[in-house]
Amino acid sequence: MAALPGTVPRMMRPAPGQNYPRTGFPLEVSTPLGQGRVNQLGGVFINGRPLPNHIRHKIVEMAHHGIRPCVISRQLRVSHGCVSKILCRYQETGSIRPGAIGGSKPRQVATPDVEKKIEEYKRENPGMFSWEIRDRLLKDGHCDRSTVPSGLVSSISRVLRIKFGKKEEEDEADKKEDDGEKKAKHSIDGILGDKGNRLDEGSDVESEPDLPLKRKQRRSRTTFTAEQLEELEKAFERTHYPDIYTREELAQRTKLTEARVQVWFSNRRARWRKQAGANQLAAFNHLLPGGFPPTGMPTLPPYQLPDSTYPTTTISQDGGSTVHRPQPLPPSTMHQGGLAAAAAAADTSSAYGARHSFSSYSDSFMNPAAPSNHMNPVSNGLSPQVMSILGNPSAVPPQPQADFSISPLHGGLDSATSISASCSQRADSIKPGDSLPTSQAYCPPTYSTTGYSVDPVAGYQYGQYGQTAVDYLAKNVSLSTQRRMKLGEHSAVLGLLPVETGQAY
């Protein structure tokens, strides 16, 4: 049908069934109100303008029939937030009208008594200005300077607009209706006016749907039985994202709704992602020597070994009851590799072990070919050089017995015990353990006597770790002394530094 000459064809709204390209940028569509856009659901909207009235009616009708807001959003191609806001406002106020566009609501600063006086003054003198009404209120004593609101003039103007503006609008509407009746019905303006009136009547905002909606109540948590959980877990092992057919089949088998099944899978996927992240963190921590274990994993304190595996031997003293017992500290990280190296070198010093009757480590602890346990802090923290020493004990040269000999003295150790000749060059770099507590300080007897406690026990006992640490420290001092002597000889030959200095800075 061709349009009448001289008329502008009205743009029809696109039907909801049309498919719009879903790209990253919204598609612009021409609408009677201006440039519209297409949302991600394919629906047309105008930015900053309220949703059309017929769509608001449709939203309320669908909600009245029990359709969920998410389904309403997909079918009408309206955003979920818009649907929820319209339904919430309809439940609270019973109206589907949109709110005010921009601005803030005016403040009601004038009291009802003051408003009555304003109306009375306006009736007496219709040409009275707002500031004149304010002065009249102050003069008559209805308000004083301290109680006059700051926006009294604007409040008076608003009251005048509300009370007396309606009458003026009604008079203007009556005049327009009279002028419209005088126009011919067969004219172009009359035809378009009739069409416009019909469209306006169909989209009148004042026509409320008057449909009762169920008040949204908070749903109680669903409790699943063991049989239902078993069925759901089996389905979750097959797929984490079941389709609609799988969900409906599960709903029939478990006597649940399809929505409950969908929500259960969503929660189960979240729990699975959390568990997977925790497992990855635990696997990463196992790769690090000092990594923190997960919270649910039992841990053993490092260097806490049973006494039955490492027995101690008591050396009886004939002439006295005084015992000199070293109190070692727990080995630090710096000593981990050295403990294992010293224990490996104990095989080459069998004469020293037989002399003092000290028991060595078990084969399972010292065997390099034994399976590595992730809970063993010593084996995990070893460097490749230390592992090579463990695999080849003969690489460590045997030391003379004089470097390792510990001779307990009857009646206590002399405080002026001199350092052995092999350790004389190391004496300045070793600090005494005076600052440490006596019960926990560790010092070998060849260096100092401040780290020993005197107990009246008939017997001389060495802990396994104390003896191993003594061996390691003595061996370390001897090896470093030999290296420094060789370095001094090479430096003297090359003429780099005099031999007397001992160390270059």
From Swiss-Prot:
Residues 167-224, 389-409 are annotated as: Disordered. Residues 167-188 have a biased composition (Basic and acidic residues). The keyword Transmembrane helix does not apply. It comes from the Eukaryota. Residues 113-163 are annotated as: RED subdomain. Residues 27-210 are annotated as: Sufficient to mediate interaction with PAXBP1. Can bind to DNA as a heterodimer with PAX3. Interacts with PAXBP1; the interaction links PAX7 to a WDR5-containing histone methyltransferase complex. Interacts with DAXX. It is linked to Rhabdomyosarcoma 2: A form of rhabdomyosarcoma, a highly malignant tumor of striated muscle derived from primitive mesenchymal cells and exhibiting differentiation along rhabdomyoblastic lines. Rhabdomyosarcoma is one of the most frequently occurring soft tissue sarcomas and the most common in children. It occurs in four forms: alveolar, pleomorphic, embryonal and botryoidal rhabdomyosarcomas. This is Paired box protein Pax-7.
